[in-house]
Amino acid sequence: VLGPARILTQPSINPSFHASLNSEPYIVRSTYLTPGLLVLLISGIVVLPVLQHFDQEWTVWLHEQGSHKLGIWMGRTMFEGKLPGASDPPVLFLLASFILYFRSWSSQASQGLIRWRPFLGFIVTTALAGSLGAVHSLKWVIGRARPYEVWGQNWPFSEWYEFGPHFINEGIYRGSFPSGHSAVILSLLTLSYIWFNGGSNRPRARSLAISWGVIVIILTVMMGIGRAISASHWLTDSLGMILPTWAVLHLLFFHLLKLPVQLEYLRSSPSLTDLPRFWELKFCGLCLPILLGMMFIIFGFRSVRFQETPWLLSMVLIGVLLVSFFWPRMKSFYSQVFQIIHGNPETENVRTK
């Protein structure tokens, strides 16, 4: 997985596939792609600074006035030997998606499961890149103290964009920003994208997608409130990250994994046998050392900021080497996969620039 990307054989593609890329449904989806992403990004950038002004005041109020039973239920999980909590159903959903994803690549997989393979790959990539990769990397490099540490243990308060007092050697869950519980709940939004863009133009499917999306956002807000009640997170850790996390999910669906293009390819090649097995996992595996390299770079500059361990500045060099080594390999593998999907290497090279 982490070696140089192999050369993939170019398959024969049904000519109707290229014509389908210019069909009206695909053009409509592409037309609203960039504005949708911009709306999410701009809204997220606006909401975070606005919420920042009320971060401490509202978190204190929720902790004092809110239902502590709600806070306990939102935070606990049966995976830590406790009673089931609010985050358990999304975690079980992600685990089931992983199992079905591996099953969909089996030679005995049914056609129905094979048709779901692009969607399962999207869910798996979202879980690895968003709920795990982005969330925990930010926790480790930001190191923000949680409310109960600031109020009861005299840890210094820091804003969401500032380096906090925690370091990764204190534990992988010590950082407050962003909220992993909220990110897990928001991963259920993948189903809305699947139902809305799954190739069915039925109003019922799209109404279901919109309704489910509203429910997921409400559940995520409730999770953020519950985590503030239990003094485990500031509001900016959870509510402030809804739109940025949603933007990452949107980016994965349309820009990076290009699900509409994959669905058109699926119609022309129903078995999907031309694609490398578990290619989404391999892609995530190549992105992991790049993410680690970026973290090393930030850790290095963070050591200069605190001036306690200046020798950690050497991590910048390690990070640069990791990014420099794995970035071209990741890009090469990604391009080769979509050369197969598009069936035209020159076209894919133009589209990925």
Set out the residue ranges of the language-model regions:
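Membrane-interfacial, low-structure loops and terminal tails that flank and connect transmembrane helices
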Residues: 7-30, 107-117, 201-207, 260-281, ...
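N-terminal transmembrane-helix/juxtamembrane module of multi-pass inner/ER membrane proteins
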Residues: 18-98, 139-146, 154-157, 168-169, ...
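Membrane-interfacial segments
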Residues: 62, 105-110, 141-146, 150, ...
